[in-house]
Design a protein with these regions (language model features):
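N-terminal accessory scaffold of Fe(II)-dependent oxygenases
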Residues: 1-240, 248-304
């Protein structure tokens, strides 16, 4: 009898906490707050609305160490993952791959990309392999990290001037964007807009995105885009944005912008995402990618 009661309590506990991971907020507004403490921040984030707040005055060393010039020195020849925004809008495309370039090469590419369609993200490995970068990122944890976290991920995002990422959403417990150089323009819409965004679940790259280009929609999506209501904000240097799970968002980069991302997940969040995680690993192990060789420069070709 006692054992049955314990099992019931355990199942009830799991149900309450896992179901909380699926809760969504649909209010079309962005909260703004003055940072007071991590406890206060977690209370506001639990409402699952976008939250904009100043973090530069709270942890100035983080922003000072990750400026555009410092990132160039820290990354230099490190290889970053580069994507072309246009690949997301190819008809019937369900997966978008990346190429790897040294950060210096990407920096040069972004400066000559007049059309604004290259950006880099998914650079978690670079940060984990760099003791200096890991140390800098860990300084922000006491101000952002919720309780009972079992998984922490950091990222560096940047793009050509004017590059606009596709509408996407995530399922993490906490995800923050922090601008350390330049500025970004973020557009967001709640989960209920998914019926107009034609959601694509890319389990090969564990990415959930929309093939609908909000800025210049394909004629087949134009009627749907007119029904989408959005909120938007500009994030300057020193500010942070909490992106709630299941909120669609798109980022527009300005010149020389550096965005740092911190993502935190609890055991309950990982449990709630097990079906998607399993599909990702199955897809990952069953997919064989062909690595494209870089195009040789004219001078190199002549030497062959």
């Amino acid at each position: 009898m006692f054992l049955s009661f314990l099992i019931f309590i355990l199942i009830f506990f799991l149900y309450i906490h896992i179901s909380d991971q699926y809760k969504k907020s649909e209010d079309l507004e962005i909260y703004e707050m003055d940072y007071k403490s991590n406890i206060e921040l977690q209370k506001v984030c639990a409402i699952k609305q976008p939250v904009l707040f100043d973090l530069g005055s709270v942890c100035p060393s983080f922003f000072e160490n990750l400026t555009n010039d410092n990132i160039k020195e820290l990354l230099d020849t490190s290889e970053v993952k580069v994507k072309d925004v246009n690949d997301y809008y190819i008809l019937n495309n369900t997966s978008v791959d990346y190429i790897t370039l040294s950060y210096d090469s990407f920096d040069q590419l972004s400066k000559t990309d007049s059309e604004g369609h290259y950006f880099t993200e998914g650079n978690t490995d670079i940060i984990e392999e760099s003791n200096e970068l890991s140390s800098i990122y860990s300084k922000i944890d006491p101000f952002l990290k919720p309780y009972f976290v079992v998984q922490t991920k950091y990222d560096i995002l940047c793009g050509s001037d004017g590059t606009v990422t596709p509408m996407r959403y995530h399922t993490n417990e906490r995800q923050y964007l922090m601008v350390t150089s330049g500025s970004i323009h973020v557009k967001m819409t709640p989960w209920k807009s998914r019926k107009y965004l034609h959601e694509n679940k890319d389990f090969e790259n564990y990415e959930f995105w929309s093939p609908v280009c909000i800025a210049n929609p394909d004629p087949i999506y134009k009627e749907d885009t007119e029904k989408i209501k959005m909120v938007e904000c500009i994030i300057p240097v020193g500010s942070a944005l909490y992106l709630p799970p299941y909120w669609w968002y798109s980022i527009k980069f300005s010149k020389d912008t550096i965005v740092c991302s911190s993502t935190y997940n609890s055991a309950m969040n990982i449990l709630s995402n097990i079906p998607s995680i399993v599909r990702y690993y199955l897809q990952f192990h069953n997919t064989h990618k062909k690595v494209l060789q870089p195009v040789l420069e004219d001078d190199e070709k002549k030497g062959l």
